[in-house]
């Protein structure tokens, strides 16, 4: 039970790397002394910089170094055993003579899976593993990383807002469906993805800014890291600076794979969203449920011929309803990653 508490802490630390560590996985580590005191902790912040284990061990005060041979390190992902931009973390744990290492989940990739465990045990470090429920959470945390490497495409999230009577918009005007509070949820989703895509019609009709101002208004660096794509045949003069256009989904996904972008948020409109759904190119979907029907400014129902229906998810996929920022969202998860990779 005590092990679980520290692994929970490692998981929480790992999640802090969501906006910055891609294309690397999120990893957290906690060093615990023989008396149960946390001696040091850390997480992987960004590629090329210290891994979680390095940061956690570097956080241990000099006066606590003598405690390391009786201490345990908790790591959410198997410590690496290969030389890349940084030395192997497993070798560092051995070098610092830690007594024990508790691992959240084994590296999911066959060519490196288990090698960190082997290096640790050969170096005299006791190795234990988190229970199944925590193992699943450690894997799920890195679903974007796993999706890109196993499926050869980014993790794809669909997101839209729909009126109570099932419409996403109108052909001649914008519908106000989200509240200022629920927009924060959408911007948080944007911040957790490396790229956004909308259709040509959405670009022309809505002139969206596609930034994260409602979630992290001062995060200029994060806005610059966000790739913005338009799906459709778009003239150069129509594209805002820094945005890119692709005529086909396959071209977009191939470009993202080349660029090492692990996650894509698809925001609309209906035609674009439905294209991803029909090709089974989605891993997660969020649909905000508006509280009003599609009405004009005077409260009258709009003619049906002016309305654009919301996308239709396959009936075989069930959804959960969750409350975020005071609004109900329907949430779907594709079984693909769970069935094939244990997520």
Residues covered by each model-derived region:
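Generic secondary-structure signature for well-ordered alpha-helical cores
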Residues: 12-19, 62-65, 122-125, 143, ...
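Enzymes that bind and transform nitrogen-containing heteroaromatic metabolites
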Residues: 1-25, 40-41, 67, 85, ...
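Proteins enriched for Cys/Gly/acidic motifs involved in redox and nucleic-acid/cofactor modification
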Residues: 20-21, 48-49, 132-161
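Zn2+-dependent cytidine deaminase-like catalytic core
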Residues: 31-137, 256, 275-277
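Short low-complexity, flexible loop/linker segments enriched in glycine and/or proline
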Residues: 116-118, 142-146, 212-214
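Hydrophobic, well-ordered secondary-structure segments
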Residues: 117, 135-142, 183-190
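Helix-turn-helix
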Residues: 28
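Extended hydrophobic/aromatic-rich secondary-structure runs
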Residues: 118-129, 148-150, 156-157, 162, ...
